[in-house]
């Protein structure tokens, strides 16, 4: 593009900014180049240290495998530094073009002065001044156009850069694709195990459990046992009614024996209240009172028998539950307020 075809107002207006954005970008690329260079040096140092302590065919294969990656880091660092240098060149060209351009206020002053002289040039007395202003304006035009053309040329040259290349693949692409397929199949298998076993459920039951009306359905299901009980009661009533109808349709000759049949099969039940036999204050069956051979244990044991069973004190715990009964009735009760004293004590 030839910028000399544009008036100076246009060129001066478009180059009024500063070169600071270019300088910031150049600094960023420079820092990236330094970081990559440092990474390459550390990479080489680590690999050399590993090869020194680990020797053999495996060590050689490892060193040969990682060598392309170190070379890629070094190449990328060099390209980043080249980009930083080119941006710095563009920044310098921009600053030079900005300095070579005529300031926009100067051009505006030239145009306004010419307009005023042309307006008041009634007798041609301002014609020489008008020609001088036009010549100066033409110089501004040429100066801005040449500065913009020089800047455009330098910027286009700096934009021609060596493209960056991606690093070498870390694995065989075919094997990597196969690995992805295996991972996908494993995920599908695990997912099939983790999925709910809905295939074994009846479709109607699954629909019942998954519908939004499940609470209403659950309430309906909970009432089914009650309905069965009611149906059973109604069925028994129906059976009794049918039996009554059948009895009514029988002749008196057959009806009499059938009416006596329940009493013949089921014995009569009788009960009385408040007439039970008693022993003391305890109500007992009649057979207990009729059997006179039962003798209380307290009367059967002679009074001259030993006062207590032999053995340790633990053996006497079994008699604790008999206190107040047949055995406890003959035991002498000691008053808690009497203190026994030995005759020898006086």
Swiss-Prot record:
A GO biological process of this protein is: response to host immune response
What Pfam families does its record include? PPE, PPE-SVP
Quote the subcellular location field of this record: Secreted, Cell wall; Cell surface
Question: What does the record note about the induction of this protein?
Answer: Up-regulated under microaerophilic and anaerobic conditions, nutrient starvation and in the presence of palmitic acid. Coexpressed with PE11.
| Chief subcellular location | secreted
Please provide the record's keywords in A-Z order: Cell wall, Secreted, Virulence
The positions making up the signal sequence are: none
What's the domain remark here? The N-terminal domain is essential for interaction with TLR2 and activation of HIV-1 LTR. The PPE region contains the information necessary for targeting and anchorage to the cell wall.
- State the family it belongs to: Belongs to the mycobacterial PPE family.
What does the UniProt record say this protein does? Answer: Induces pro-inflammatory responses. Induces host TLR1/2 heterodimerization, which causes an increased recruitment of IRAK1, MYD88, and protein kinase C epsilon (PRKCE) to the downstream TLR-signaling complex that translocates PRKCE into the nucleus in an IRAK1-dependent manner. PRKCE-mediated phosphorylation allowed the nuclear IRAK3 to be exported to the cytoplasm, leading to increased activation of ERK1/2, stabilization of MAPK phosphatase 1 (MKP1), and induction of TNF-alpha with concomitant down-regulation of MAP kinase p38. During M.tuberculosis and HIV-1 co-infection, can stimulate transcription from the long terminal repeat (LTR) of HIV-1 in monocyte/macrophage cells. Interaction with human TLR2 activates the NF-kappa-B transcription factor, which binds to the promoter region of the HIV-1 and induces HIV-1 gene expression.
Q: What is this protein called?
A: PPE family protein PPE17
Q: Which gene encodes it?
A: PPE17
